């Protein structure tokens, strides 16, 4: 006998398909926001029935990373929210590394950042500080990338150590 897919199974498959589409669109929106293509990011976000509010927040915080000063706006700490905060922190790192550093520890404990995301945020903070020859760059880089997996970070760390004449490190 030919097995026909029941209504419940169809509904389940469709729901799963929509979920995949949402996550696919959400990741495209994140890439667009990272590339500063806010028009594309916004149009993708509008097509996200389940994640549109969080998607809009991601695009907003990418453009106005100061919004991170109010952590209550970024709750609950879902995966989409963690993406928004991560992107915001990387933007903030370039504008105001001190503020980004202060916020990173708090957000790192409440958000679900992947190890790579933490390294990526710390890298932005560290590199911005390193370009200003600020020795705190070393602490940030060492704390979040102790294995020095990131080559750019390793190079800047070395330059900074030489510049600051800290031979023992």
What are these regions (language model features)?
Residues 1-169:
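Alpha-helical solenoid repeat scaffolds
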């Amino acid at each position: 006998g030919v097995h026909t897919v029941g209504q419940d199974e169809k509904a389940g498959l469709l729901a799963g398909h929509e979920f995949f589409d949402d996550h696919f669109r959400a990741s495209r929106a994140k890439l667009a926001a990272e590339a500063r293509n806010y028009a594309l990011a916004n149009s993708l976000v509008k097509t996200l029935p389940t994640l549109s509010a969080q998607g809009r927040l991601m695009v907003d915080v990418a453009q106005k990373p100061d919004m991170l000063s109010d952590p209550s706006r970024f709750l609950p700490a879902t995966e989409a929210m963690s993406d928004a905060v991560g992107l915001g922190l990387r933007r903030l790192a370039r504008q105001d590394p001190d503020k980004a550093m202060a916020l990173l520890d708090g957000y790192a404990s409440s958000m679900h950042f992947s190890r790579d995301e933490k390294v990526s945020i710390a890298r932005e903070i560290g590199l911005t500080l390193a370009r200003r020859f600020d020795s705190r760059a070393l602490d940030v880089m060492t704390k979040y990338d102790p294995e020095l997996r990131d080559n750019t970070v390793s190079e800047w760390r070395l330059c900074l150590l030489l510049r600051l004449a800290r031979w023992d490190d």
